[in-house]
């Protein structure tokens, strides 16, 4: 699975790509250097694998035709531009013996007045859809919806292209620090029910690694079992999948479900990143503290600790459960520390502030130990590349624990008149509709104030 149009910002930022990018994230269509680049990728993959299947991507290329392409050619029909590109890439794939599949969203977005993939009123012109190569499969990706009828309607609209249709659903582990089984089960059961009704023969389970890929792939084995069951079960249900999971792996399905820390009964259905927000938010700036204060998160994480503590040794994956037991203890200790610090500061409660400073010192030690456990999990499952992201993030947290603790102690000793961060009013995270809610924000950069 590669990208041959968008999602290429990390490589297009380098100088070699200056002549072949439409915008910072999207390749420049009709530029010959673009196709030399794409052919080099596909040729390399031909030497690395035996399969005849290749996913050529092309999703979320929102800027296609609107950047350097526009500068060179003026505004052109973006559908026509896309189709020319698809044909060129398809021909390259065929040259190396591959049968390509591609994401379908750009065809819907271009045909939607709202530029919305899931716009049921998007116009797909037969005269254009007929130009999609007949041997290219279209992949409908949808990880979000909880409505069988919506999935069925979208599948029917895909069939209008007259090409082989594949469905890609989500085995959710790309938000927060934990797998998301509640979301996975509900979306997948409904999506695959629709696929069954619409006679879709091929499905894909995606496990994206957004924002660093913090969650172990092995925590989502049970989700993969649910997708696997689609190939041989008449009707899917979670209880049957649990039995099949035990049969196939020997593992306890309920133990895996217990790792879903973020299945908090909040007003917002997709409050999926609380663990990550708690772990990374600054203890004095309190970006999420006003939202967190509405919930007994300490009690919630205490329940998680009890639940995981009651699980017997999980054999060769016990290392994962040891990691999550430790994470739960950190989250319990840290979830309301910012609220407590601010409350004590506003009340000029010096004794309580000093206790909070001690907690920050404890958290510093806890994060150092957590780093060791995270390193162990990562090295079991991944190459080393990418782990530097967590070293930088956790290293930054350690420096802030030290700095914030020192500020509190200096204030308590009357060595300074104020703590500037605590003199500022904290706000609700999000918009007016987010008051009192836990939120799904999961990007690290959006957990920083500056």
What are these regions (language model features)?
Residues 6-9, 63-65, 110-111:
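Short, well-ordered, mixed-charge alpha-helical segments that flank or form enzyme active sites
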Residues 17, 59-63, 163:
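Short connector loops/turns at beta-strand edges and beta->alpha or beta->beta junctions
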Residues 1-15, 50-53, 206-210:
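Glycine-rich, aromatic-flanked loop segments that form ligand/cofactor-binding clefts
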Residues 35-43, 47, 51, 71-450:
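Substrate-binding groove of N-acetylhexosamine-processing glycoside hydrolases
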Residues 2-5, 14-17, 169-171, 247-249:
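Secreted glycan hydrolases and related glycan-binding modules that recognize and/or cleave
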Residues 1-3, 58-59, 104-106, 208:
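Short, well-ordered beta-to-alpha junction loops that form the rim of enzyme active sites
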Residues 4, 22-25, 30-72:
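Active-site groove signature of glycoside hydrolases
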Residues 9-12, 31, 136, 147:
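Solvent-exposed, flexible loop/coil residues
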